[in-house]
């Protein structure tokens, strides 16, 4: 489904980035980094409405020829960015939304770990396994 999944801290540094295939890793890192400007624009456009809103899904941030970039923001302003292959036309908006909810739940589990210091890179096997299950297996 996804070819790159990133968790970005409130201060815009990466807590976790995973991409496949690895030969395009730098390209995906660039796409995630550039999408943060769009995330900030969407958050500021929503203004106070975002505080009252329970749904933090930002939707499609921007499409490219080969990929689509989607975003999600938590209440603590941690950003989730997902890059999806554009050729996968069967993937619907509600499926992307449920993938972000699953990612958010797993991130919450990481945050509840007493040995995790908020702001550190995420190095959880359970989180990594969940992200791997969302990634496309490219042959």
Swiss-Prot record:
GO terms for cellular component: cytoplasm; endoplasmic reticulum; Golgi apparatus; nucleus; perinuclear region of cytoplasm; TRAPP complex. Signal peptide: none annotated. It comes from the Eukaryota. Keywords: Cytoplasm, Endoplasmic reticulum, ER-Golgi transport, Golgi apparatus, Transport. Transmembrane segments: none annotated. It holds the Pfam family Sedlin_N. It is found in: Cytoplasm, Perinuclear region; Endoplasmic reticulum; Golgi apparatus. Gene3D superfamilies: 3.30.450.70. SMART domains: Sybindin. Component of the multisubunit TRAPP (transport protein particle) complex, which includes at least TRAPPC2, TRAPPC2L, TRAPPC3, TRAPPC3L, TRAPPC4, TRAPPC5, TRAPPC8, TRAPPC9, TRAPPC10, TRAPPC11 and TRAPPC12. Interacts with the heterodimer TRAPPC3-TRAPPC6A. May play a role in vesicular transport from endoplasmic reticulum to Golgi. This is Trafficking protein particle complex subunit 2-like protein. It comes from Rattus norvegicus (Rat). The lineage of its organism: Eukaryota, Metazoa, Chordata, Craniata, Vertebrata.
């Amino acid at each position: 489904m996804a070819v790159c999944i990133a968790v970005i801290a409130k201060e815009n540094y990466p807590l976790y980035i995973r991409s496949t295939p690895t030969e395009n890793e730098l390209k995906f890192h660039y796409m995630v980094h550039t999408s943060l400007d769009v995330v900030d624009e969407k958050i500021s456009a929503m203004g106070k409405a975002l505080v009252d809103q329970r749904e933090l899904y930002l939707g499609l941030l921007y499409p490219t020829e080969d990929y689509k970039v989607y975003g999600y923001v938590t209440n603590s302003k941690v950003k989730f960015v997902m890059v999806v292959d554009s050729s996968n036309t069967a993937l619907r908006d509600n499926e992307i939304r449920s993938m972000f909810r699953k990612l958010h739940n797993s991130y919450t589990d990481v945050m509840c770990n007493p040995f995790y210091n908020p702001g550190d890179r995420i190095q959880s096997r359970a989180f990594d396994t969940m992200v791997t299950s969302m990634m496309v297996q490219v042959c």
